[in-house]
């Protein structure tokens, strides 16, 4: 970074501003110390430990207690640590103490697949441990043969990923792992998988202008076409995205095309309307005197009270100065309701009263299943053409059973924890036959699919100008001076942080692409210049479209930003053909009607009490 530092110095530095920031750091550290002390006190009062405590406590025990350390050193004849590329320094220290220099350590890992930096993983730890083992007389073995992809796809992946990761190690960038070419084990693709084994389907325009939604429609059409041509099944496809916020464009497109799909984990599950309704209904069953949640339950498809009916309940509530639950269970608004709303209200009052008595006495899964049976909620969703919603309801019921929780409040806290914590990625993975799977790249780690689609390829990774904690430079505060410049030390730390994030983004692309067995497809949107030629792209596509890889940007093309055509471009990833189709905004994919429109139900094994009629 010497060149960058000289550039910054050349622009001049506001020394007074730098001094003020330096003086603010101790105050920031003091504030952090107070917050940390309160957090520690709260954990002590609750007798709870977080994951950081478990790691720190285990390491301290091994470091400070010789008897405990010797006990566990004798316990293990050998140590095998898998996925070592996703460990951190503290975990490495624990392994070192347990090994005690006896040469009994065996680690397995691939630094090119280290993608959990946001959880504290440090790919540098893997490199350091690998070098230490070899210095101590151990041996390193590289497993370069891919038993997943066939010869031509492996050749294409090598050509695609080599320029992305680079081939030379840089001692100044120990967090960047260079590319190592894969070797194929399998010669031919499976029958029915003809060339091209790499495809790009890109829609012209911006995301704000709906280009990603159009890209989703084009992809859905291509999936239908591939399945119609046989012998592929919808279950052979997986759409992998950098982040779950890209899911909706593909979910909606598949739904419009009548293609069955399953969204695996992600943030979207608990945001689905049918799941929000059921969680709200569980709250109403636990406490029907809560007017807000009860009103939401009554308006849900389970009870389907009309807006007019809800208005009359609320009006009676205000006039009588009582709660909606009292109005409902005593039928006080009966004279104001239509015949239909009167029946809905009576049915809702009977079901809520009956199930309210079960809350806290039986597991929440039993309460939820009793509600679903009493209201035929899943059947109603299927009848309304929402088979996906019915599958989501089945998944929620399975989650409720798996949790083993009795109290509704405790279960809702459990759900909120899953929704809001990082553990939502890859949780509750369900197996389904005959449905396209949509998941994040992190959730796909360790999996493989016949056809992998990398979705929203122009999406960039995270980033921003927040507070940084640099291991060498300390806390770095992003406060601009009067010339809108960040402090020089912050810019130095930010440059290093951005470089580490970029290196992990490259590894994330490597993981996504190498999940494919037969075919790799890239999907997303692309911008064009005023003359109709291709603009420089962002995200992974920006990396892959350059001259060193696919050279997409170098191909002559004349797109009409308001047209309805599709442009075919024959690209090469090395010697592997890559067919690229660019769709103008008005293009409409001709989706042939499918013979079967029903979507498969996810069958989850539940214990007898939940299956009883």
Question: Residues of each region from the PLM?
Answer:
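Short, solvent-exposed helix-loop connector elements
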Residues: 379-385, 491-505
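Anion-coordinating catalytic cores for phosphoryl-, nucleotidyl-, and glycosidic chemistry
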Residues: 281, 480, 496-513, 517
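Conserved catalytic motifs of ABC-family nucleotide-binding domains
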Residues: 463-499
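P-loop NTPase Walker
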Residues: 37, 42, 46-52, 57, ...
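Active-site-adjacent bridging/hinge elements
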Residues: 5-10, 29-33, 99, 104-105, ...
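Conserved helicase NTPase catalytic core signature
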Residues: 1-70, 404
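A conditional alpha-helix N-cap/helix-loop micro-motif detector
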Residues: 61, 212, 216, 501-502
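Conserved motor-region signature of P-loop NTPase helicases/translocases
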Residues: 7-8, 74, 81, 85-303, ...
């Amino acid at each position: 970074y010497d060149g960058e530092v000289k550039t910054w110095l050349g622009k001049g530095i506001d020394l007074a501003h730098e001094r003020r920031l330096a003086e603010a750091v101790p105050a920031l550290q003091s504030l952090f110390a107070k917050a940390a002390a309160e957090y520690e006190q709260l954990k002590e009062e609750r007798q709870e430990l977080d994951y950081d405590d478990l790691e720190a406590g285990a390491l301290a025990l091994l470091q400070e207690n010789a008897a405990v350390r010797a006990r566990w050193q004798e316990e293990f004849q050998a140590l095998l640590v898998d996925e070592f590329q996703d460990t951190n320094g503290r975990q490495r220290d624990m392994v070192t103490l347990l090994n005690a220099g006896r040469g009994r350590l065996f680690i397995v890992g691939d630094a090119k697949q280290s993608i959990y930096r946001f959880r504290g993983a440090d790919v540098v730890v893997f490199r350091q441990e690998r070098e230490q083992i070899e210095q101590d007389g151990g041996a390193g073995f590289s497993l370069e043969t891919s038993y997943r992809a066939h010869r031509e796809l492996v050749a294409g992946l090598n050509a695609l990923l080599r320029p992305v990761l680079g081939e030379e190690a840089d001692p100044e960038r120990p967090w960047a792992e260079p590319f190592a070419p894969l070797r194929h084990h399998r010669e031919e693709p499976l029958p029915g998988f003809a060339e091209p084994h790499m495809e790009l389907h890109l829609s012209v325009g911006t995301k704000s202008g709906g280009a990603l939604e159009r890209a989703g429609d084009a992809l859905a059409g291509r999936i239908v076409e591939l399945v119609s041509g046989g012998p592929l099944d919808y279950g052979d496809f997986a759409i992998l995205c950098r982040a779950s916020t890209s899911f909706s464009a593909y979910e909606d497109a598949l739904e419009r095309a009548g293609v069955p799909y399953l969204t695996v984990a992600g943030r979207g599950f608990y945001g689905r309307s049918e799941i929000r309704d059921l969680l709200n209904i569980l709250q109403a069953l636990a406490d029907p005197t809560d007017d807000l949640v009860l009103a939401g339950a009554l308006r849900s498809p389970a009870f389907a009270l009309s807006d007019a009916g809800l208005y009359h309940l609320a009006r009676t509530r205000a006039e009588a100065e009582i709660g909606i639950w009292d109005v409902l269970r005593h039928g006080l608004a009966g004279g104001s309701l239509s015949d239909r709303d009167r029946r809905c209200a009576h049915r809702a009052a009977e079901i809520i009263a009956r199930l309210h008595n079960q809350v806290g006495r039986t597991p929440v899964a039993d309460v939820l299943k009793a509600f679903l049976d009493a209201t035929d909620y899943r059947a109603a969703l299927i009848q309304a053409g929402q088979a996906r919603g019915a599958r989501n309801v089945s998944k929620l019921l399975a989650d409720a059973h798996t949790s083993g929780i009795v109290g509704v409040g405790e279960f809702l806290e459990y759900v909120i924890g899953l929704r809001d914590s990082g553990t939502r990625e890859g949780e509750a993975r369900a197996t389904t036959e005959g449905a396209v799977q949509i998941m994040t790249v992190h959730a796909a780690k360790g999996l493989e699919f016949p056809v992998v689609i990398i979705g929203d390829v122009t999406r960039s990774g995270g980033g921003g100008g927040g507070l940084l904690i640099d291991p060498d430079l300390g806390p770095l505060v992003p406060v601009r001076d009067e010339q809108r410049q960040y402090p020089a030390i912050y810019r130095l730390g930010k440059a290093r942080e951005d470089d580490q994030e970029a290196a992990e983004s490259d590894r994330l692309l490597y993981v996504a692409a190498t999940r494919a067995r037969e075919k790799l497809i890239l999907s997303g949107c692309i911008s064009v210049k005023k003359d109709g030629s291709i603009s420089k792209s962002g995200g992974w596509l920006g990396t892959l479209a350059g001259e060193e890889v696919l050279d997409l940007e170098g191909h002559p093309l004349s797109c009409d930003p308001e047209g309805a055509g599709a442009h075919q471009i024959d690209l090469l990833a090395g010697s592997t053909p890559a067919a690229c189709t660019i769709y103008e905004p008005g293009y409409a994919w001709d989706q042939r009607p499918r013979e079967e429109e029903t979507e498969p139900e996810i069958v989850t094994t539940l214990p007898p009490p939940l299956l009883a009629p």
